[in-house]
Amino acid sequence: MSDNQSWNSSGSEEDLETESGPPVERCGVLSKWTNYIHGWQDRWVVLKNNTLSYYKSEDETEYGCRGSICLSKAVITPHEFDECRFDISVNDSVWYLRAQDPDHRQRWIDSIEQHKSESGYGSESSLRRHGSMVSLVSGASGYSATSTSSFKKGHSLREKLAEMETFRDILCRQVDTLQKYFDACADAVSKDELERDKVEDDEDDFLHSHPNGDYIHSSIGSKDKLFQHVSPKGINGIDFKGEAITFKATTAGILATLSHCIDLMVKREDSWQKRLDKEIEKRRRVEEAYKNAMTELKKKSHFGGPDYEEGPNSLINEEEFFDAVEAALDRQDKIEQSQSEKGRSHWPSSLPSTEAYTTAGSHRFVQAPPSCPPPTDLVSSSDEHRFRIQVEEMVQNHMTYSLQDVGGDANWQLVVEEGEMKVYRREVEENGIVLDPLKATHSVKGVTGHEVCQHFWNVDVRNDWETTIENFHVVEKLSPNAIIVYQTHKRVWPASQRDVLYLSAIRMVPAASENEMDTWIVCNFSVDHDNAPLNRCVRAKINIAMICQTLVSPPEGNKEISRDNIQCKITYVANVNPGGWAPASVLRAVAKREYPKFLKRFTSYVQEKTAGKSILF
């Protein structure tokens, strides 16, 4: 048995298996999903000491990292569709990363997996660091045997292996000794045969006389001389019987020690099997709990994740989409309510005392008082600009069709009715996109149609009542009563952010007869403009009209007309193509919720702004 096969376990257990070198550090530029506003941004990423950190750029590493995660329990997931993207998740924290190309992504994944495998959680290196021998005998406490060696926890098997090493040395020496003995015996036998042949050939030449005259052979003495060295103690002083007894005892000791080692290993195996069974059961329960947790987590969705927002490959279903939108709208409503309560204290409630109320005679429908300039002076019907024909067509269409009563039309559904306000909807879809026309009718006391339309059209007061706009600006002023406006709406996650580019025109349509009402109308419809190209937002298309008619109830006697005597009949029509990939059920539910809120909020704002002021007919 060669020495290089020694079972000596006195050295470190880590030497039983060659450990690989430390994992290679890595750094470079990766695109990281920051948030739903800025999207993917290049970041300097560093992989070092089982930690993944990122910086805004390579030049800003000295200012400290923007974030880091430990890879010990990280889960690395290559994206199913994007060949350059991979996600790293630790508990509920997720990093979304994109490489330059698939090969670049694979190199990063391999490096991260290498660091993770060396982290000490279930890796081969962690098993080596714990030590194979100690692990095998860690449960041997209390083992009872007839051997005189120590059977304390962590030492029994090691000491038995040391005993077997000693037995091996003894056995090797005994084998060498016995081999020498057998070799000597073989040599002696060979020499004996030669001597016997020689004696038989020459025995006649060596006769001796006996006193009685007989001749005898002298070979007895020579034979004694020949075989004197083959006695048990005659070859190199070796005690064959003693060596045989010792050899038998040594082999018996080896067998006993080996049997004891096997018993220890069997006991360890039983112990580890029980622990394995417990771990398997524990793992089963943990996996079941993990699946349940993941199911619950998916219901809540990862806020801001690129896979959990509106898009063709969105992982969020319609129910979860609606829940998320509704929750975001509720939060926004609370913020708007608190802001509106603060803003109301700053709204002027009355005009200076030098201004007087406008008066008019008793009539059923409003006519401008003589002291007021004619409406055509305020809003001309003969604007000259490049969209003039489109504006005229829109106004005529709305005056023809939008004022028609749809209450008895089976194609229109009454979706909301609150007091004087009624909201109708006609379901229309085109290529999977919801294009439902909505029509609302409302009656508001204390305001005129001119006042309502003026506040709806005037961009100077837009932010006072419009709470869904993030920012807007006038792209071009076509005429005193026609402008092109670009506005970006606040994003409601997980829906994509949307913008609108539209022409807004205000117009008064005089009454055709004395018994009819003058009508004020604001038309907003989508147009294109070079100064507002498409961007990261989803461009929505709109065709909206606010149509208002003023009714006046005659005051008693010769009293002046007050706001108690006026009432505004409002017809609001909206045709919106939202674009994008939002589910139809979500769009309809949001429209049903938001349109009535908008009308109530806007009309209340006009009432508060005009209260105590002169009437604008």
Curated annotation (Swiss-Prot):
Catalytic activity reported: N-hexadecanoylsphing-4-enine(in) = N-hexadecanoylsphing-4-enine(out)
Annotated GO MF terms: lipid binding
Subcellular location: Cytoplasm; Golgi apparatus; Endoplasmic reticulum
Feature: compositional bias, Polar residues: 1-11
Domain START, first and last residues per copy: 383-611
Gene Ontology CC annotations of this record: endoplasmic reticulum; Golgi apparatus
Region (Disordered), start-end ranges: 1-23, 332-355
Residue ranges of the motif FFAT: 320-326
Classification via Pfam families: PH, START
Protein name: Ceramide transfer protein
Organism: Xenopus tropicalis
